[in-house]
Amino acid sequence: MKTPWKFLARLASRQPSGKTQESSAGNDTGSKTLEHTSALPPSPTVAASPLARNEDVSVDQGPIASDKPAGHNGVAQALEPPIHADEAQTTARDEADQSGAEANSLAPKSTASTKSQRKPRIKRRERGKRANARVDAQSAVVQKHYQNLQQSSSRDLFFHELATLDEEIKMLRTQLAQKLHLQNVQLKKMLERFELS
């Protein structure tokens, strides 16, 4: 049995010949879509729907009841991005070639039309720069506002703590005064007893 990494390396290193690629272009896309659909995990709604009908079983147990091991889906998903990336690169190249051909066919137009096309682009760039400047200014204002809120909230917090500390100090002073008074009374009683004897 091959390891997934060897399989992946072999799959990535395959380069079909030019003739077979042109003749079987339709077949390759069909097989790739089949690979793509077979490699996809079942949707959670499909897996959860039979379980949801059963009132004794919760919906959270849907992934546990899956017949497929979790490792295989990860390998299949790891294989998919290179295939899609290759397709995206080839379609991007084809589109670039087509747009280049269209640009060459449109080249004989007058220079006035190209100048008029350039002006809106410059205006768009200026608008973009203005919008970026506005966004930057707004973000700076928001940051200043946030900092002011933090400072004001930290100031409020400081003053609140200061006020509570003052209240605690007053309360402790009164308690200390009461205890000292009681101790003084007790000491006087003890001294009176000692003097009498």
UniProtKB/Swiss-Prot annotation:
| Organism superkingdom | Bacteria
Q: Which UniProt keywords apply?
A: Plasmid
Q: Where is the composition biased (Polar residues)?
A: 14-32
> Spans of biased composition, class Basic residues?
116-132
Compositional bias per record (Basic and acidic residues), positions renumbered to this chain = 83-96
Region (Disordered) spans which residues?
A: 1-135
Q: Give the family this protein belongs to, as stated in its UniProt record.
A: To Rhizobium NGR234A y4nF and y4aO.
- Name of the protein described by the UniProt record: Uncharacterized protein RA0936
